[in-house]
């Protein structure tokens, strides 16, 4: 064999060794929870997600591929992308078939942006069927968009909870859950648990310390901003974002990108949402980049979209132990 051939063989062997190593680590890792995003947050580790507002390809094949993502969770957009529950169901089946993921979890966590605007409780109640259908596919969390009003957020938490759970009921007017039992069988299959175990675990964390659902709200317009202190007091919410794109439009800021974020009105809006998150022990979501991820973490950002490079920098800074 000539020199070039030997070099090619060495490269191939190195790649195969890496694949085998990842597989062995995933198989030997023993996750503490079903939802890796929650597991990491309980350990004080920031979490990094992948996904875009253009949507995720809702197919079994894409799910198999994404099962080995670098990210801590997958943001699956159905707010602006089509509301295709069948596609989401096939995607979740693919994730389960392609797992375990790199951290040893059965699947990466999936959190869905559902096209329900939280303008008021009536709007959320009228569209609660969307949460039922999405959760039945076995996802691990849901984001409520334009969460403007505390009544809307209470209705959101109500819609995703089974009535067998009572943590927080009556606190700040939180009602009993209204989620129905049908759909449990399909979700339990994705999680790899019995139907009874799914019913016990499919509850919002950290309201329920043993819950495996991560709920988030988007405080992304001037109406939400006016109510943000009360909004984030509602029990059951785990994370919140300030949605700079929609916030800029709502505040009349016509600049784009960094120029918009640096506008004084935007700086004040972000600071208000961050302060409300800290006051209510809710994790703040903000975009990360390779240049600012360390500073963001120091500021208190615990959730955000990130490239593989950015996630690697953040994980190194916080001394996150492998596998990931």
Model regions: which residues?
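Expand to "…catalyze enediolate/carbanion chemistry for C-C bond making/breaking, isomerization
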Residues: 24-324
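Generic short N-terminal amphipathic or hydrophobic helices
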Residues: 3, 21-23
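Bacterial N-terminal signal peptides
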Residues: 11-20
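Bacterial N-terminal signal peptides that target proteins for export
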Residues: 1-12
């Amino acid at each position: 064999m000539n020199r070039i051939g030997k070099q090619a063989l060495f490269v191939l062997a190195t790649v195969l060794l890496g694949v085998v190593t990842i597989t062995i680590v995933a198989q030997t890792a023993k996750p503490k929870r079903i939802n890796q995003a929650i597991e990491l947050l309980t350990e004080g580790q920031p979490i990094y997600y992948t996904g875009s507002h253009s949507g995720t390809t809702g197919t079994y094949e894409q799910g198999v591929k994404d099962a080995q993502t670098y990210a801590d969770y997958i943001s699956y957009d159905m707010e602006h992308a089509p509301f295709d529950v069948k596609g989401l169901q096939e995607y979740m089946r693919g994730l389960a078939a392609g797992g375990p993921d790199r951290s040893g979890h059965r699947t990466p966590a999936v959190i869905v942006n559902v096209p329900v605007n939280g303008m008021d409780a009536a709007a959320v109640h009228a569209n609660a069927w969307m949460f039922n259908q999405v959760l039945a596919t076995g996802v691990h969390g849901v984001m409520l968009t334009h969460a403007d009003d505390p009544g809307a957020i209470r209705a959101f938490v109500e819609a995703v909870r089974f009535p067998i759970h009572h943590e927080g009921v009556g606190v700040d007017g939180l009602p009993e859950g209204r989620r129905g039992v049908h759909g449990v069988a399909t979700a339990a299959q994705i999680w790899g648990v019995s139907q009874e175990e799914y019913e016990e675990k499919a509850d919002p964390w950290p309201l329920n310390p043993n819950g495996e659902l991560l709920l988030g709200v988007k405080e992304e317009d001037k109406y939400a901003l006016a109510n943000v202190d009360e909004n984030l007091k509602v029990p059951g919410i785990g994370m919140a974002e300030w949605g700079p794109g929609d916030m800029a439009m709502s505040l009349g800021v016509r600049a784009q990108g960094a120029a918009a974020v640096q506008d004084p009105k935007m700086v004040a809006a972000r600071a208000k949402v961050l302060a409300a998150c800290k006051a209510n022990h809710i994790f703040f979501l903000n975009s990360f980049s390779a240049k600012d991820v360390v500073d963001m973490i120091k500021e208190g950002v615990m959730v955000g979209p990130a490239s593989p490079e950015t996630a690697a920098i953040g994980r190194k800074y916080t001394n996150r132990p492998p596998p990931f």
